[in-house]
């Protein structure tokens, strides 16, 4: 990825508004090997359900924490997004969207316990995803005049909307599904399902965004975007609506002007409805969730960002009808968790040294087909 001169100024901005990473990270591991969080997205009382992760990857429910807002309700995948529930880079904060009340909630993370510390309007309708980089937080509002809105994050984990930070997407009701910062914080990418566009915004030194650079995805069905640590942008694509097992994943490099250059275009996932992806913290693998097939596929990430299928590509199989939505990986890159809306479980898979998956069980503490969206883990 080419570099631009604003990088150093952006780092200075992030440092000036950044919350205390070290002090909060110290309390983020007060119990268990880690934690997993899911969001019920209830239209009456949006809540986060937390689980303590043990060393063998199994989960024990730890608590329920109200966001102070309302979700959208629904049945299966009502938010149609990746990133409705997002951990900060150091796992000390958890951000949750309240799609029904148009707000974002911020929690301090103490192991598997949460403390609500802030809640702010998102500056738009139906927020469905959030991304964080240092002291910057951007929220995706999918309803009406679809937009992204920026906030600064101070030492007390309080949000403040950045003046003139609203950027509208290329169409109203864009069905935008995800947003992600590049690893160096220079770019924010947003996927639009209605147009099959990937919008790129350069992040300015004051935290606002530059003009929209519109990129057409090389494959149909652009849904979720995530970045590998080496800077490659990884896009999950559902594929043609009428095709069977036609979902794909593509990787791109982001050039200095915001245009995307394909690296691996349309690598088959051998499943249906690949809408979500997750990159392991060690940067070696990316996994995708084929919701309509109830399967997980995996790919190794090369030094150039090229994608290579791991083994037979389909590595994890949930029970038929699971409708696995969002997926998350533990901080040690040893376990993958899938939010299975169809049967009301969290699927648990062990990640082997070669990237293959082993099914090690499931947790049963969520309600089937009740509108759950969003999962995060460390």
PLM segments and residue spans:
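Beta-rich, blade/repeat-based domains predominating
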Residues: 27-31, 68-90, 122-136, 167-187, ...
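Residue position within the beta-strands of beta-propeller blades
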Residues: 38, 96, 139, 190, ...
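Short loop/turn segments immediately following the C-termini of beta-strands
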Residues: 41-43, 53, 99, 142-144, ...
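Structural motif
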Residues: 45-49, 103, 147-149, 197-200, ...
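Short loop/turn segments immediately following beta-strands, especially the blade-tip
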Residues: 51-58, 107-113, 152-159, 201-208, ...
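A short beta-strand motif characteristic of beta-propeller blades
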Residues: 62-76, 115-121, 162-169, 210-216, ...
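Aromatic- and glycine-enriched pocket-lining scaffold segments that form the walls
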Residues: 138-206, 210-224
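Blade-level signature of beta-propeller repeat domains, shared across WD40, Kelch, NHL, RCC1
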Residues: 341-378
């Amino acid at each position: 990825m080419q570099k631009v001169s604003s990088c150093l100024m952006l780092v200075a901005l992030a440092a000036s508004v950044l919350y205390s990473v070290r002090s909060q990270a110290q309390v983020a591991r007060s119990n268990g090997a880690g934690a997993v969080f899911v969001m019920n997205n209830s239209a009456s009382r949006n809540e986060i359900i937390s689980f303590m992760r043990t060393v063998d990857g199994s989960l024990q429910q730890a608590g329920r924490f109200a966001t102070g807002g309302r979700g959208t309700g629904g049945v299966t995948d009502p938010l149609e997004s990746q990133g409705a529930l997002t951990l900060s880079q150091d796992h000390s904060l958890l951000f949750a969207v309240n799609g029904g009340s148009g707000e974002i909630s911020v929690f301090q993370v103490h192991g598997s316990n949460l403390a609500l510390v802030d809640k702010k309007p998102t500056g738009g309708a139906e927020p469905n995803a959030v991304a964080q980089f240092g002291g910057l937080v951007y929220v995706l509002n999918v309803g009406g005049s679809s937009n992204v809105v920026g906030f600064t994050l101070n030492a007390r984990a309080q949000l403040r909307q950045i003046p003139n930070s609203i950027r509208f997407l290329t169409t109203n009701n864009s069905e935008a599904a995800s947003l992600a910062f590049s690893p160096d914080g220079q770019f924010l990418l947003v996927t639009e399902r209605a147009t099959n566009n990937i919008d790129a915004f350069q992040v300015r030194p004051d935290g606002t965004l530059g003009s929209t650079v519109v990129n057409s995805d090389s494959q149909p069905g652009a849904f979720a975007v995530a970045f590998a640590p080496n800077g490659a942008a990884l896009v999950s694509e559902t594929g043609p609506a009428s095709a069977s097992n036609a979902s794909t994943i593509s990787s791109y490099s982001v050039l200095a002007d915001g245009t995307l250059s394909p690296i691996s275009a349309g690598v088959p996932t051998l499943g249906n409805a690949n809408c979500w992806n997750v990159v392991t913290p060690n940067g070696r693998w990316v996994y995708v969730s084929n919701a309509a097939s109830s399967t997980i596929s995996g790919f190794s990430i090369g030094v150039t960002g090229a994608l290579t299928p791991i083994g037979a590509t389909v590595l994890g199989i949930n029970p038929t009808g699971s409708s696995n939505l969002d997926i998350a990986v533990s901080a040690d890159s040893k376990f993958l968790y899938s939010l299975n809306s169809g049967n009301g479980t969290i699927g648990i898979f062990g990640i082997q040294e070669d990237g293959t998956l082993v099914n090690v069980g499931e947790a049963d503490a969520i309600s089937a087909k009740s509108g759950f969206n969003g999962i995060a883990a460390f």
